[in-house]
C-alpha cells in the first residue's frame, strides 16, 4: 500500500461526514450533466472506499440515493474506476454547497465562507486531498505533497487555505490545470495533523527520523573512512621517507628526538598521530609529533 493510499484509508476509516469535504470532492472530481429529467451529477474516483463515502454523504445530508458504477481502465494501469451517479435533487445539492455557476457548471473557486472559517477549511482540505491529493513516500527522502486542480484559481484557493495554517504552499500551473504543493517535511506532517491523519503523521515522522539517522551514520562512517585513508596515506609517505633516510644516512644519524618517532612509525604504520604521541617514552602532544614527522620528511626531501 502506498503512503498516499494509507493516508486516505485512515481518513475514510474515521467515518466523518462533512458538507465542506463533500464540496471539495465534487468540485475536484465531479461533473454535471443534463438528462430529460434535469441535472445529473457524476463523481469519479479510483478509490472504492471513497465511492462508498460519497454514497453515504449524499444519503446523510440530502437523502439522495446515488448509484455506484464501475469499469476497468483500458490503459496500462488497468485500475478499476468508480462513478457515483445521481439525478436526484442535484440542483438543490449544488445550491446548498454553493457549487453551481450560472451556466450549469461548477464554480471554479472556493467559497468565501470556507476560506474564512478554520473548521470548514480543514474539512475542505481533507476533501481536496481525498479527491486529488498525493504524498511522495517519505522513504524516498524527497518530500512532496501535491493537490491537483483543474483550474488555477482553485489551486490558488487551496494554497490560501494551507497558508492560513502556516504551511508554505506554492502553486504550479501545468498544461492541464494546476497543482498546489508542499515540499518541506515539517509542512507535510502539519498538513496531516490539519486533516486529522494522526497515525500517518506519526508514521511519516518515524520514517523521516530513521532515514536521517541512517544518513548521519553513513556520513560519520564515510568521514571516519576518509580520516583513516588520510592517516594511512600520510603514514606511508613518512615510512618511505624513513626508509630513504635509513638507506642513505642511517637512522642513528638522526637527532635523538626524531629517532624514536621514526622507529615507532615504522613499527606501527596504522597508528594515528595521537596513538604515536601516547606511545613515546616521553609524552608529547599531537602537534609535537606532527612537528617531528615534518622534520623527518624535510630531511628525506633534502637527501
Curated annotation (Swiss-Prot):
Q: List the disulfide bonds.
A: none
Alphabetical list of InterPro entries matching this protein = Homing_endonucl (IPR027434), Sporu_reg_WhiA_N_dom (IPR018478), Sporulation_regulator_WhiA (IPR003802), Sporulation_regulator_WhiA_C (IPR023054), WhiA_LAGLIDADG_dom (IPR039518)
Q: Which SUPFAM superfamilies match?
A: Homing endonucleases
Source domain of life is: Bacteria
Q: Give one GO term, molecular function aspect.
A: DNA binding
**TM regions (residue ranges):** none
What role does this protein play?
Involved in cell division and chromosome segregation.
Q: What is this protein called?
A: Probable cell division protein WhiA
Origin species: Streptococcus pneumoniae (strain CGSP14)
